[in-house]
Amino acid sequence: MHLSIIIPAFNEERLIERCLQSITSSLAENFKPGFTSEIIVVDNNSTDNTANLAKQAGAQVVFEPINQIGRARNAGAAEATGDWLLFVDADSMLNPGLFADILRLIDDGKSVGCGSTVHMHGLPWWANLTLQLWLSTSILFRWASGALIVCRSDAFRDVGGFNQELYAAEEIGLSQQLKRWGRQRGLQFIILTRHPLETSSRKVALYSAHEVTGQILRVILHPRRTLQDKKQLSVWYDGRR
């Protein structure tokens, strides 16, 4: 089995090395004969040293000039040669336990893909409440967080990848399409819960409660209009790092 690990990255020089180290450590601890992998970092038009740091760490670097996370993930998938695709965000860290669970799911042959619960350190009460609400929703509806989504490469290509009309929440649409694809073939799409993915809480540190909750409310009240307009998604796209 050959696994392609794809990391979209826009101005991630502070965190990309940490992310890549977590991946190489997880790969090393879960090595087994017959398993191969590749790591692809998609430089999503960065203006910092992200691409050079990724190359120095041994990753293949692909350039995507249009700053859009779904488009960046698709660009990485277009270069991938794996039977399975693992998308993980540059501000997240894989852990060996989670990676082992992913490999077991792949070996089991009963799933089209999976997502994972996530953990963030140092959240204020309102942000932790928001996270817990999302986690409950994710598990109930089997919607993957964008921070980590894993799927068969043939399924990904059959459903058309990430929706490039959306600038955020495209992982929910992909989760739904993968569930449908899998259901037709007797396969499931699940959310792993034993070893949560560690992801950064920088949005909470960089944006006020008013900014974050306002962004969430706009998405809830006017989802299509908001998610298709990059200018209305400042928490994702204004470049604060």
Walk through the language-model features, giving the residues of each.
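Cell-envelope/extracellular polymer assembly enzymes that use nucleotide-activated donors
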Residues: H2-S4, E38, G173
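Short, well-formed alpha-helical segments that are part of the catalytic scaffolds
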Residues: E12-F31
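Acidic helix N-cap motif at the loop->helix transition within catalytic regions
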Residues: R14-R18, T47-A57
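A conserved acidic beta->alpha catalytic loop
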Residues: S22, D43-A51, S92
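Glycine-rich, basic loop-to-helix element that forms the pyrophosphate-binding segment
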Residues: E64-A80
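Short aromatic/hydrophobic "clamp" motif used to bind/position activated sugar donors
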Residues: L85
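Conserved donor NDP-sugar-binding/catalytic core segment of glycosyltransferases
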Residues: P96-W126
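A short, conserved alpha-helix in the catalytic core of glycosyltransferases
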Residues: A155-G160, E165-G186
